[in-house]
Design a protein with these regions (language model features):
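Signature aromatic-anchored transmembrane alpha helix within multi-pass, membrane-resident enzymes
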Residues: 3, 24-27, 202-206, 228-237, ...
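Catalytic lumenal/periplasmic loop and adjoining terminal transmembrane helix
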Residues: 35-42, 243-253, 279, 289, ...
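Hydrophobic, aromatic-rich transmembrane alpha-helices
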Residues: 116-118, 298, 305, 331, ...
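Hydrophobic/aromatic-rich transmembrane helices and adjacent perimembrane loops
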Residues: 147-148, 154, 190-194, 199, ...
Length: 565
């Protein structure tokens, strides 16, 4: 008896094999970039120190107390805590080693897995070519690749957000209640990672209502209402317990400030207080990144010609340069546009806008494509508000916009190249294939992408290692930069009574960075050298070690405490 195979089964098998090969290539690419950057990280980001401490507190304290006292949302620290279980068994070592490795692995793994929903989202929006190249380019562009390797919450946030968008797109096409409920659950999880995750649910709700008002006018409201109810209920079910525990929408300083009407105050009005010191008299290294808002949580130098603060990670408010409301608005628009351009590697935003215009007819149906556009617009509005209130815009906050925009950019390039090559113009012989253009963009971006993370902070790492070998638990560390105190082991001190009373405190160690561009925008500036010397302080370590102390970039002073001079 002859067995005749079903052609549709062969076609389905071929499609899945092709998808599998493309996904394998994406996973290998993402893994290679993550591993390279993890192996070439001098220090973790300052925000990651807070996340590591957060995860450590979840392990050692009551969760309700920890959630209320920390400013960041808990899902990424919970992911770090979960990752620390196998890391502790495999790697071992101190809490510093375990938690830092766990934070880097949690962030890196989420960044790798991101290629899967990105591929399928692009496949749903256009085709698998668009999904493949959008995911590949996003992994290779400097801002996204480096943030996803830096032990920050963005990787987990982007992974969950992309899954939510994929579920929303499919739910709009099928009308499935399960899809909207799943999207709501993912929106709640995205909110538990970063507060702007709630915008996903808002974008889906706007698209649902818009479709009823402008497309399906004859459709009864009951179906739309049930889909909205499923979306909102799922979001509330996931996000509600955290909101109830903290008794508010968010503990983040910036998020709370966004709900107020005041424009940001000058940085000169923000001074350090005794809150930056812990019970041992040393700098609380997990506080500075969060307690007074992100305006002071990064470093940078000023372009004196324009009076605008610039750093590797953000654009800062120009103190004293703009005072009126129109000035605030224009500066905020400039800052947002600059960070978006940087996120798109300065060129990819152009085909993204072309793609939006070319495929604008799709938006008339108020479907999944509209969800993506509304989400990007809502994120832009939120970042404008951040710029107006907090006085800064960070590149990592525009990543969800870059992620969504790359689909339109890739689709536009395919459309333009195919149209040119099919035309009768002589230019078609000079027009390269779209894949070659994408490869050229990747090759240009990779050198910047693969630069070591925070290589300019090697000195702080060295100071921290020196402190770890020479200080006693009772000695104080005054470190406005966080890294030296972190690598000295002060991040994970157990706050037990009498823990530091077994030995007598002798010195207050003060980290002083001699580079002016590395001292700007910190919560508490380094004490002037003259004051340290007058207090009896002496330089006990300098970096680089091979140069004379007068030529050193970083000085470590040991100042005798009262009664020990």
């Amino acid at each position: 008896m002859t067995c005749i195979s079903n052609p549709s089964e062969k076609l389905s098998s071929s499609v899945w094999k092709t998808n599998g090969v493309l996904l394998l290539v994406l996973l290998i690419l993402a893994t290679a970039i993550r591993v390279w950057l993890l192996c070439h990280t001098e220090v973790t980001s300052r925000d990651s120190i807070g996340f590591e401490r957060y995860a450590w507190e979840l392990e050692h304290k009551k969760w309700k107390q920890v959630l209320r006292s920390n400013l960041h949302h808990p899902l990424y620290p919970l992911t770090v805590l979960a990752m620390s279980v196998p890391v502790r068994q495999i790697v071992g070592g101190s809490d510093l080693v375990v938690m830092q490795a766990s934070a880097q692995l949690a962030s890196g793994l989420a960044g790798i897995l991101l290629v899967i929903p990105m591929f399928f989202l692009g496949k749903e929006l256009f085709d698998r070519r668009v999904g493949f190249w959008a995911a590949a380019i996003f992994q290779c562009l400097p801002v996204g690749a480096r943030v996803m390797s830096d032990a920050l919450s963005e990787s987990v946030f982007l992974l969950i957000s992309t899954i939510a968008l994929l579920l929303a797109l499919r739910a709009f096409r099928t009308g499935s209640m399960t899809g909207f409920v799943g999207c709501g659950c993912c929106a709640g999880l995205a909110y538990l990672t970063r507060p702007e995750g709630i915008l996903i649910a808002v974008a889906v709700a706007v698209a649902l209502v818009g479709r009823r008002l402008f497309v399906q006018r004859q459709k009864v409201w009951t179906e739309i209402a049930s889909q909205l109810a499923g979306l909102i209920a799922a979001t509330a079910l996931v996000a509600g317990p955290y909101i109830a525990i903290i008794q508010g929408f968010s503990n983040k300083t910036t998020t709370r400030d966004l709900l107020k009407s005041e424009i940001r105050q000058s940085r000169s009005e923000l001074t350090a207080t005794d809150e930056t010191r812990n019970k041992h008299g040393s700098l609380s290294v997990f506080v500075p990144c969060f307690i007074r808002g992100p305006m002071l949580s990064a470093f940078g130098f000023r372009l004196s010609d324009f009076g605008i603060g610039i750093s590797n990670f953000a654009i800062w408010w120009p103190d004293g340069k703009v005072s009126d409301l129109p000035g605030h608005l224009w500066w905020s628009l400039y800052a947002l546009a600059s960070e978006l351009s940087k996120g798109f590697f300065y060129v990819a935003w152009i085909p993204a806008l072309i793609g939006l215009f070319t495929y604008r007819a799709r938006l008339r149906f108020w479907s999944g494509e509209m969800v993506l556009l509304v989400l990007c617009l809502l994120q832009c509005l939120a970042l404008l508000r951040v710029a107006m209130v907090a006085g800064y815009v960070a590149d990592r906050h525009v990543l969800i916009i870059v992620l969504g925009g790359l689909y339109w950019a890739v689709a536009a390039v395919f459309f333009l190249v195919e149209r040119i090559r099919k035309g009768a113009s002589w230019f078609r012989t000079l027009c390269p294939r779209a894949a070659l253009l994408f490869l050229a963009l990747v090759l240009v971006a990779l050198p910047k992408t693969l630069e070591p993370l925070h290589a300019n902070r090697a000195g702080h790492h060295a100071v921290g290692l020196w402190l770890a070998e020479h200080i006693t638990p009772a000695d104080e560390i005054d470190d406005p930069f966080c890294w030296a105190a972190h690598y000295a082991g002060r991040t994970f001190l157990r706050e037990t009574p009498g823990a530091s009373l077994s030995c007598t405190p002798c010195f207050r160690y003060v980290v002083h960075d001699c580079r002016p561009d590395h001292r700007d925008r910190f919560r508490k500036p380094s004490a002037p050298i003259g004051n340290l010397v007058a207090a009896g302080g002496q330089v006990v370590y300098h970096w680089p070690e091979e140069v004379h102390v007068e030529e050193a970039n970083i000085l470590l002073f040991a100042v005798p405490l009262t009664g020990n001079k």
